[in-house]
Amino acid sequence: MIKSARQLKDLIRNLSKNKSADAQILMRNYMMERFLERISLSEYRDKFILKGGMLVAAMVGLDARSTMDIDATVKGATVGIEEAENMIASIVSVPLDDGVEFRVKRISEIMDEAEYPGIRVSMETEFDGVVTPLKIDISTGDAITPREVRYSFKLMLEDRSIEIWAYNLETVLAEKLETVVSRATTNTRMRDFYDLHILSQLHGESIIPADLRAALIATARKRGTENYLADAPAAFDEIEADSNMEKLWRAYQKKFAYANDLSWHTVMESIRSLYGLTQ
């Protein structure tokens, strides 16, 4: 068990060198893991379903994807600000001998380009005097197809895993594919494009095409974008040919070293191949 900030910083410094990852991001990731373990031991362990960047990073490795927050959906419940407040209070009160304290700073409705309505919880953690900001986005009503899965989440600094519920691979891919198709050149989130590429490269053999097709249709139906799917090939051509999109990709490459060697064309070809599995 990590007992001091100095010990934690030393471990993270060494890991950042080995993984070529930013130490500040790794520190935040460690604190997100502390929250995730509390979820796994809480009364909400069967309602919280991990998705988003933290799940993708776990699937592909921290040296291939970084993330700054936790995305989750809550199953079988409507989550407003009051419900979220009660839920988070219960989770952070789970007793764990890790010395980490959580403080909720703000709870608000998500208004920024969200595919689903939800709640954003801004927190900070404190460990041996070190304060780290944390953000959790919680949604409800997501179309998980065919269903969520049990996921063994490997901890960053310990040789063990925690068992949580998570999106299945096909739903992770379907949500990002739908976003790429429906938003076309208005989607400035280059991580969607990168995630589709890296997941297809590292987990392509695990993809079940029928499940990916069903998940894509279910996601589009939920978001009211079914009519866009038939025009996906044209959308991909438009996206790849758009000079601003390629400029955004180059900026993403400069920011994240793990994307350095990936051409825009290579990424778009991966996305075309993924979409082809749904046909």
Mark where each language-model region is.
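Structured mid-to-C-terminal alpha-helical surface segments
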Residues: 1-48, 57-66, 70-279
